[in-house]
Regions:
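Conserved adenine-nucleotide phosphate-binding loops and their immediately adjacent elements
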Residues: 166-189
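Hydrophobic positions on the alpha1 helix immediately C-terminal to the Walker A/P-loop
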Residues: 224
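Hydrophobic anchor at the beta1->P-loop junction of P-loop NTPases
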Residues: 213
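Walker A (P-loop) phosphate-binding loop of P-loop NTPases
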Residues: 218
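N-terminal pre-P-loop "Q-motif" helix
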Residues: 184-203
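Conserved lysine of the Walker
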Residues: 221
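Conserved small/polar residues in nucleotide/adenosyl-binding loops
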Residues: 233-236
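Accessory nucleic-acid engagement/destabilization modules that flank
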Residues: 1-167
Length: 236
């Protein structure tokens, strides 16, 4: 999937045609279902940027990217050779705690690229822009700073974003890397999370018995087993 111009995408007045246009611009393999509030928030963001900078049309973002297998999604990512800007879009009121949790998690995933990361959230219903500080605090942000971050010198990444983020980069072995495991510096794939939920439900329902799962080598079976053990310990 390629980056696109949100300025170009938000010029279209009909949401019925947005999905088709987005696919043409990004080269996405499958059509993306864009909800009305998402489109509205993106249009509001573009309008705000136009008030503070001249060349909004030149900004390139990866829109609604989801890391394969992990199911982790980002609303807007500007990726350059020397820094990353992440902007999350919200339409309704959301707590600073929830915003902070999401942006910190996003930063962890993005850190594999080993570049400085600037993290923002825009709440369109309040016309509120916030950012995550280097000390992991949520503070109100000004548009001038966001525009400055977006216009920093650097070369836009023009390749497919899937080539930068692979699930195996986030899978660790609790046996060979116990410190990272104990610090929970890992994330399970969506399939692993589903398996864990089912097994824990069965354990609580039946209280005894044998529970198992299988998979080919390299799919994170050991990590899942250890995570289930930790989760069960915490819940009992």
């Amino acid at each position: 999937m390629k980056s696109l111009s949100i300025y170009t995408l938000t010029r279209n007045q009909s949401i019925e045609h947005i999905s088709k246009l987005e696919r043409q611009l990004s080269g996405r393999k499958f059509p993306l279902k864009i909800r009305t509030w998402e489109w509205g928030s993106m249009r509001a963001l573009a309008a705000q940027l136009e008030m503070y900078m001249q060349e909004v049309y030149s900004l390139r973002f990866f829109y609604s990217f989801q890391i394969p297998r992990l199911g982790k999604e980002f609303d807007l990512l500007q990726i350059k050779d020397n820094h990353i800007v992440n902007i999350e879009l919200k339409s309704g009121v959301v707590s600073d705690q929830a915003i902070r949790k999401q942006l910190i998690q996003n930063r962890y995933y993005l850190s594999v690229l080993e570049r400085p990361i600037q993290s923002y959230t825009y709440i369109s219903s309040q016309n509120r822009l916030v950012r995550l500080t280097h000390h992991d605090h949520i503070v109100d942000a000004d548009w001038e700073r966001l525009c400055e971050d977006l216009q920093k010198e650097g070369t836009n990444y023009e390749g497919n974003i899937e080539d930068l983020f692979r699930a195996e980069l986030y899978l660790i072995s609790p046996i060979t890397d116990p410190v990272r495991f104990l610090k929970k510096e890992y994330f399970l794939t969506s399939q692993q999370r589903d398996i864990e939920k089912k097994i824990l439900r069965d354990i609580y329902a039946k209280r005894s018995g044998c529970f198992w799962f299988s998979g080919i080598p390299g799919t994170g079976k050991t990590l899942l087993l250890y995570d289930i053990a930790v989760s069960y310990t915490h819940l009992t």
